[in-house]
From Swiss-Prot:
Binds 1 zinc ion per subunit. The keyword ATP-binding applies. GO terms for molecular function: ATP binding; glutamate-tRNA ligase activity; zinc ion binding. It comes from the Bacteria. SUPFAM superfamilies: Nucleotidylyl transferase. This is Glutamyl-Q tRNA(Asp) synthetase. One of its GO terms (cellular component) is cytosol. A motif ('HIGH' region) lies at residues 26-36. The keyword Transmembrane does not apply. Catalyzes the tRNA-independent activation of glutamate in presence of ATP and the subsequent transfer of glutamate onto a tRNA(Asp). Glutamate is transferred on the 2-amino-5-(4,5-dihydroxy-2-cyclopenten-1-yl) moiety of the queuosine in the wobble position of the QUC anticodon. Keywords: Aminoacyl-tRNA synthetase, ATP-binding, Ligase, Metal-binding, Nucleotide-binding, Zinc.
Length: 315
């Protein structure tokens, strides 16, 4: 079956590409902090500059990491900050049938296979210094052990089958970071779409949900830049619309680590929303001086447009 003949069931049908639709997609692993606010603000401003729609999607399918009540706390913080989505928020955990349907489509075109390897076995199979050094976000480069069969092992996970050599190279133009290229076979190998614990991998879930919601533009942190080629590859396999990407610099702590709950990020102070917004804008290269939130947003939208113009004429 050719890629052009792929048809999704209605549950995973992609909305047609049209006017700008962006989104902020936090995971409910803790309260909103300055690092995630930077991404939320950038995505909101980008939607406003382009006269588009801004959505919020709670990416809560990694149930082991979810913090009870964090989703509602994040939404409450966004509302206090004036970042209110144009449509009702969605929860990724409500979309599991979409992901199953996408997996079935990939299996139908022989781009999916079961894997019985453990992480320890994969690590032990990587013996050269060069291979050990080629890790992306602590993702082991899969050597393809189960490509031709499980060899008596029980299936643990499901992996996408990549093409060989240069056919596995994906390039895209990031609106902030510039042209990016990655050879998926060399950088990550056949990557997991459904994990051994039954959880869905981020790569397949975000691709399917973005398409279903008609997302045209993704604005997010540069820590996810490395994931983008995998997502573009899946979009192409599934015949989904292309998405434009903009990856903003991540906020780091004094040790140079990405600011997160694990590295001591503090929750946004909802009693001082203007101060939080001003700090987030500064991380984006925007110096906004305003007496109130209305004045902040009135100044921030044209400031973001000017910031984009400094990056690239096509932004």
């Amino acid at each position: 079956m050719s890629q052009a003949n792929l048809e999704f069931p209605e549950s995973v049908a992609a909305a047609p590409r049209g006017p700008y639709r962006g989104r902020f997609a936090p995971s409910p692993t803790g309260p909103l902090h300055i690092g995630s606010l930077v991404t939320a603000l950038a995505s909101w401003l980008d939607a406003r500059v382009h006269g588009g729609t801004w959505l919020v999607r709670i990416e809560d399918i990694d149930f082991q990491r979810n913090v009870p009540g964090a989703d509602r706390d994040i939404l409450a913080s966004l509302e206090t900050l004036g970042l209110v989505p144009d449509e009702a928020p969605q929860w990724q955990s409500a979309h599991l049938p979409r992901f199953e349907a996408a997996l079935a489509q990939l299996q139908a075109i022989d781009r999916l296979y079961p894997c019985g390897c453990t992480r320890r076995e994969i690590a032990d199979s990587i013996t050269t210094v060069d291979a050990q050094g080629r890790l992306r976000h602590q993702t082991l480069i899969y050597p393809g052990t189960c490509r031709n069969g499980l060899m008596g092992r029980p299936p643990r996970a499901w992996r996408v089958r990549l093409p060989d050599a240069d056919a596995a190279t994906v390039c895209f133009d990031d609106r902030w970071q510039g042209t990016q290229c990655q050879n998926l076979a060399e950088a990550v190998g056949d990557f997991v779409l459904k994990r051994a614990d039954g959880m869905w991998a981020y790569q397949i879930a975000v691709v399917v949900d973005d398409a279903a919601q008609g997302i045209t533009d993704v604005v997010r942190g540069a820590d996810l830049l490395d994931s983008t080629p995998r997502q573009i590859y899946l979009q192409r396999l599934l015949g989904l619309p292309a998405v434009r990407y903009l990856h903003v610099p991540v906020v780091v702590n004094a040790a140079g680590e990405k600011l997160s709950k694990q590295t001591g990020a503090r929750a946004i102070n909802r009693s001082q929303p203007l101060a939080a917004l001003t700090e987030a804008a500064r991380h984006l290269g925007l110096e906004i001086r305003a007496a109130d939130m209305e004045g902040f947003y009135r100044a921030a939208v044209p400031a973001w447009a000017h910031r984009l113009a400094q990056l690239t004429p096509a932004a």
